[in-house]
Design a protein with these regions (language model features):
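Basic, Lys/Arg-enriched alpha-helical interface segments
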Residues: 1-66, 74-81, 88-103
Length: 103
């Protein structure tokens, strides 16, 4: 999958050093894989779920469910743009923000 930028992963690894290994592993798995559908990606990331407040945004749990990765994924083109890698508490705040903003 074409992960548009590694920067969100590097930033998250610095911000959450206890989960840096899991963050970097997630990046490598995503970058090396080819996923033409959510079902294919879900085989490697069973936690994959759609983010109901934005079209084509998806959520993946990272680091034993310590963090959440929010990304725009275009399966047709096999590309991903990571929007956020954050804790569950911050994820809850983002949900409220996007829910209020609408699509």
């Amino acid at each position: 999958m074409h992960v548009i930028s590694r920067k969100p992963f590097k930033d998250a690894a610095k911000k959450y050093p206890n989960d840096a290994t899991a963050i970097n592993q997630t990046y490598m798995v995503l970058r090396k894989g080819h996923f033409s559908s959510p079902a294919e990606l879900r085989r490697l990331f069973p936690s994959l779920d759609n983010f109901k407040y934005k079209k084509k945004w998806w959520v993946i749990d990272i680091g034993g469910n310590n963090l959440r990765l929010l990304a725009f994924i275009e399966f047709r083109d096999n590309r991903m743009y990571v929007k956020h890698i954050t804790t569950h508490a911050e994820y809850d705040k983002l949900c409220k923000k996007y829910m209020q903003a609408g699509d």
